[in-house]
Amino acid sequence: MNTLFKGITAILPDKESGFSAKVCDIAVSDSVISYIGDDAVKNGFVPDRTIDGRDKLITAGLVNSHTHSYMSLFRNSADDLMFHTWLFDRIMPMEDKLTAEDMYYGTQLACLEMIKTGTTAFLDMNIARDCITRAISESGLKATISRGLVGNGRDDEGGKTRIEDTLYDMRTYGDNKRLKFMMGPHAIYTTDRGYLELVMEKAAEYGLGINIHLSESVKEIEDSITQNGCSPVKYLDDMGMFKFHTVAAHCVQLSDEDIDILAERGVYAATNPISNAKLGNGFARIPDMLDKGVKLCIGTDSAGSNNTLNMFSDMNFICLAHKGNCRSATAVSARQALKMATETGAKALGFDNTGILKEGYAADLTVMDMKYPSLQPVNDSVAAMCYSASGYEVESVMVDGEFLMENREIKGMDEERIYFECNKAMKRIDG
């Protein structure tokens, strides 16, 4: 299928400013962006269909670099709680009641929300084999999937079973080119050194990266210093974890040395600004990490703590929170936030041919309707995305040249069934 977006405003990479907007034609041939420029037809493109780009904005699809998709079931059910109370006293007891069907529909709900708000790829940490990966696969989104790994010692049978869950999903869904996999040790406070070493051995054996929660709370730092004699970042670095492609979620409580280590090792730091603020964990040192060259990307975390998976909200918040916290209007710019939410996020997930609008790259695209009072006059399209848009201006979403949503119509997912099943599940779990 050859699709032409005719005369559409596109957010394109720009060496000087990061991004610039240009009215142009964008041609998609099967799964790939084949042409960006003036008059694609005159330049030899033969479209099967042409989409009028007037009053529309097209950008690379957004990338959610940290979430727990199945936890969309827990939206608005664990609020105004401090982090450890939220996790251990509220979330984990509800997780114990989940069935495979619950997690399937919770994940479908997450995928539905992400599609409707312009996300085309995400990094997931989950708690079960098959049902979650199956739901993601059926959605059409791209995803890097990690089974959350908890264990004590190399011989922990439960810990070994969780590793096998990862390998099972890899074998079962390995033919789906939109899916990648990572090892997902949950955190240093739910694993010990022996188990982490086993996880790294398996990561090396299968050529996988690592997805881990890191330095999320003050308590995590204090406990690590007491137990390990150093920060969580230093502990994992000394262990050799950062020799792997690593995505470290949160990275809120970092020392200068920690930031230097992350920068030197090329670790992707997935900041979750809304979730971290809501759970009282504070603000990550984003301006300092940017200055040091840390690879920063943005995640929403789960709907159980955010309470949405809307990347527009987190792009907005990361800019505003750090401007206010640093008392500097230049602390984090809209263009920096958009890069975190697209290009850097895609690389964090291991998708090297997406995240920007560029010829030869995957046609993972988000199209917005800009005829809203809150967006007009647009003036600066990147600023409009970060400071004015809600996310529900998204009109169409394409992955590998396939529309997952077109003119706000979702393809291939039963919205009403998803809503019904998720509400039914929560009445049983927390009714």
Predicted regions and their residues:
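N-terminal metal-binding scaffold of metallo-dependent hydrolase/deaminase domains
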Residues: 1-45, 56
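Acidic, glycine-enriched loop/beta-strand segments at the rims
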Residues: 11-25, 279-280, 346-383
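Active-site gating loops and adjacent loop-to-helix segments of metal-dependent hydrolytic enzymes
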Residues: 73-105, 139-155, 159-160, 218-245, ...
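Alpha-helical scaffold segments that flank or form the walls of functional sites
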Residues: 75-141, 163-175, 422-431
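Metal-coordinating catalytic core of metallo-dependent amide/deamination hydrolases
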Residues: 131-252, 257
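His/Asp/Glu-enriched, well-ordered alpha-helical/loop segment
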Residues: 238-245, 287-372, 388-389
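C-terminal cap of metal-dependent C-N hydrolases
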Residues: 362-419
